[in-house]
Regions:
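Short glycine- and Lys/Arg-enriched binding-loop motifs that mark or flank ligand-binding interfaces
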Residues: 20, 29, 38, 76, ...
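Residue-level detector of functionally special positions within alpha-helical transmembrane segments
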Residues: 80-82, 155, 160, 193
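Extracytoplasmic/secreted envelope proteins and their assembly/folding machinery
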Residues: 5, 14, 26, 85-92, ...
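Catalytic-core segments of hydrolase enzymes
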Residues: 1-57, 111-120
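Extracytoplasmic soluble-region selector
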Residues: 170-259
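Secreted peptidase-domain scaffold signal
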Residues: 150, 158-175
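Hydrolase catalytic cores
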Residues: 43-149
Length: 259
């Protein structure tokens, strides 16, 4: 959209949401500019079905959509900032429900700031070009977009549900590099002084798969609180760090963010 301000999204009291594709690049249709606050998955039809968002479909009488088997409601694949915005609304609602469970409350400005700080940057993906298609009155048009045009124009980055819940719950967040090779991560700091001894790191199968973690051992202590691991996927996951001090086991859940 050439960076044009789109209202009501551009109003200062509104959270303006852009859309990113499954490879963290801008969806070809996304709004962008210094007024965009954050982004969320919006799909990109150029990538095929697997690159879109599985969404609910309402009665065809209002949506103009008819399933081949006669159903009036169901699910289908879509793209759009209309896919990205529900991600943000849902995560925001999830966070408020969790805060209420913990007995916490926020002003509008406080919660807005919390959302904005519960994001991960996609700036490193905003380089090179990508192929795209868009619809016109003349049909489908092939085009190429320069991803660098979107740098610093997609807000704080992509809203991360796990980071939001961690920030609300006071769970430590530790960042690591995702290089595909061994990296050293100071997980011991999550345990204070106890973490300077040998630490054990417990990783669920879900976390291992999500971040592509390998090359670590869950049964041996890592000295000085430094965990060595290989990571192939960016994202975030929950791991548990523990240490045995004087016969007492201390542990702390940590949100591990791979970038």
């Amino acid at each position: 959209d050439k960076g044009a301000r789109i209202y009501p999204a551009a109003y200062s009291k509104v959270i303006a949401v852009g859309a990113m594709a499954s490879d963290y690049t801008p969806s070809y249709f996304t709004d962008y500019g210094d007024w965009v606050d954050l982004v969320a998955p919006g799909g990109d039809a150029y990538y095929g079905t697997e690159g879109q968002i599985l969404s609910t479909v309402l009665d065809p009488g209002t949506a103009g959509f008819v399933f081949s088997d006669g159903r009036k409601t169901g699910y289908d694949w879509f793209q759009g900032t209309s896919m990205a915005c529900p991600h943000v609304s849902g995560i925001a609602a999830l966070g408020l429900a969790y805060a209420d469970k913990l007995g916490k409350s926020y002003t509008v400005d406080q919660y807005r700031s919390l959302l904005m700080s519960s994001t991960y940057s996609i700036e490193s993906y905003l380089k090179g070009t990508k192929d795209a298609q868009y619809s016109t009155n003349m049909g489908i048009v092939d085009t190429t977009i320069d991803c660098s045009d979107y740098r610093r124009k997609l807000g704080a980055g992509c809203l991360d549900a796990l980071l939001l819940l961690a920030n609300i719950g006071g769970i430590p967040v530790i960042t690591m590099e995702c290089t595909g090779d061994y990296v050293k991560v100071d997980l011991g700091k999550a345990l204070g002084g106890a973490g300077k001894r040998g630490i054990y790191v417990t990783v669920s199968q879900e976390a291992q798969t999500r971040l592509g973690l390998s090359g670590y051992n869950q049964t041996i202590p890592y000295q000085n609180g430094i965990w060595e691991v290989k990571c192939t996927n960016t994202g975030s996951a929950l791991v548990t760090v523990s240490a045995n001090i004087g016969g007492t086991t201390v542990s702390q859940d940590v949100v591990l963010v791979a970038r």
